[in-house]
Amino acid sequence: MKLFRKNKKISEDDDFFIALSDIMTALMLLFLLISVVYMIKVEDSVKIPKIFKETTQGLSEHLNKEFEKDLKAWGAVLDKDLTIRFYQPDILFKTGSDVLSPKFKNILNDFFPRYLKIMMDKQFINNIEEIRIDGHTSSFWGNIKGDIAYLNNMELSQARTREVIKYLLNLNLNEEEKEWLKKHFRAIGFSSAKPLNDKSQTLQYGEKENFIKSQRVEFRVRTNIENKIVEVVDK
């Protein structure tokens, strides 16, 4: 009986150590899993700034380097959101007209091939979602106000961006450049929906519109960086 009780005690001790060993193994696996997840998150946190730097910051640096000496002469600025804004209406079109001025044509002749070269560079081409050519007018339309003025300006802004696209397509571009332009460029007329103040900022409630600065043409880049970041996070 003593031998039986002794063997039983040994068996219980063995079961205890086996159970303890299983718990330790499970804890080790749990810590290993946590470590792997943490490493993945750290890797993702490195990838996201890299994606941003290579795309948005890279485009900003290239555009600034390429055009910084020309922007002032063109009556243009490069915004932080990668928008190039041509803001001197007397250079762009005659009042109420959608015909490109000779001076604006000369600017586009110089600007656009260089701009397109940057967008189609292998560093950026797969990260460009679309490029919008936005046409904006002021809210002014002679003695006409309200809805009719808005609709007249809508028609004018749309016609102007359409004429810009038409002119760009007739530049000396190769077939690859033309096809890429047609797939990625959009011409949008905003009428007077986005007027600017004296500081060339979006008009806020209670501010006075600057009728001159509100009239502009913008080349606005939209990247797919958001989609790429979502892909990284969802992995």
Question: Which residue stretches match the model-derived regions?
Answer:
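Extracytoplasmic/periplasmic, Sec-exported soluble proteins
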Residues: 51-55, 96-107, 152-160, 209-211
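Short beta-strand elements
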Residues: 68-80, 124-132, 181
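Envelope-exposed proteins and targeting segments
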Residues: 80-89, 96, 127-129, 183, ...
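Short terminal targeting/anchoring segments
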Residues: 1-75
